[in-house]
Amino acid sequence: MAAGRLAGLPPGRAATLSAPAERHASVAPARERHAGVTLGAERERSLTGVDYAGAFLDENRAFAELFRDADESTPVPTCPDWTLRQLFRHVGPGDRWAAQIVRDRLDSYLDPRMVEGGKPPPDPADAISWLHGGAQRLVDAVELTGVQTPVWTFLGPRPANWWIRRRLHETAVHLADAAIALGREFTLRPELAADAITEWLERVAVQAGGQGAPLPLDNADTLHLHATDPGLGDAGEWTVTVEQGRIAWSHEHGKGSVALRGGATDLLLAILRRRPLADTGAELFGDDAVWQRWLDRTPL
């Protein structure tokens, strides 16, 4: 599971992205604020209309296809010290781990060494089938257990379907890692990339500042992300602030100490440090130091 550091910065000039005046008038007060909780993660479909189970199986297949003829010793620069072999062995067991948690309705941590069938077979073709089987096992487990059934997660109890969404975005980001390692193009459907950003912010809101680590933003700082893909609407805007000592965010347009504007896939790759901002099509407005500090103190 992706993990990393988490949190701050000096005042800078406000950055804002242009939007119609009527949009500003309809925003903030009624918007849902997300601070230290996972709101809406239990829905089977996201604000962008993503079918989590279908998208998860699609990304699993795409991930597998990159490995069919690849040299498994290829280094993965976005996952330091890993090769494609290690990346494959990270993603596959993770799906089966989640499936077992859901199937057994666990309310406590499952030791990964106890996962049934957690190691891929040596034959490459069989390993691909094993990878597909793990993803399907999770989808089936959620269906049998019930979407809303509470189970253990590393953020506390969540509905079983939370795990499909988590594994969907874990797989999508590691698909990007594999594509970058192999010099391939990578893109996600805008609605999927936007939901990945939302899911990541939901986790940051819960985990940021843990174990005494500084928050990614200072109290006076604000980060605004604006996805330019047509049709995303509110689902393509995120304003991140600090409220009562915690990271909070909402789907709204607003001013920020720093703002990023670009396609949802470019924004996702930038905030997860898969691509330097300069290598994406995204633009930065405002205080670059706020952005750099945010990157330094948030998880990969």
Regions found by a protein language model. Give the residues of each.
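Compositionally biased, low-complexity flexible segments
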Residues: 1-35
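Short, helix-capping/interhelical loops that line the mouth of catalytic, cofactor-
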Residues: 38-50, 93-153, 184-197, 204, ...
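An N-terminal domain-cap segment
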Residues: 40-89, 98-100, 121-122
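Alpha-helical transition-metal enzyme core signature, strongest for iron centers
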Residues: 56-63, 87-98, 124, 128-145, ...
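Short, contiguous alpha-helical
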Residues: 71-111, 155-211, 267
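A glycine-rich beta-turn/hairpin centered on an aromatic-Pro dipeptide
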Residues: 199-240
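Acidic/His-leaning functional-site neighborhoods
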Residues: 228-264
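C-terminal interaction segments
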Residues: 253-300
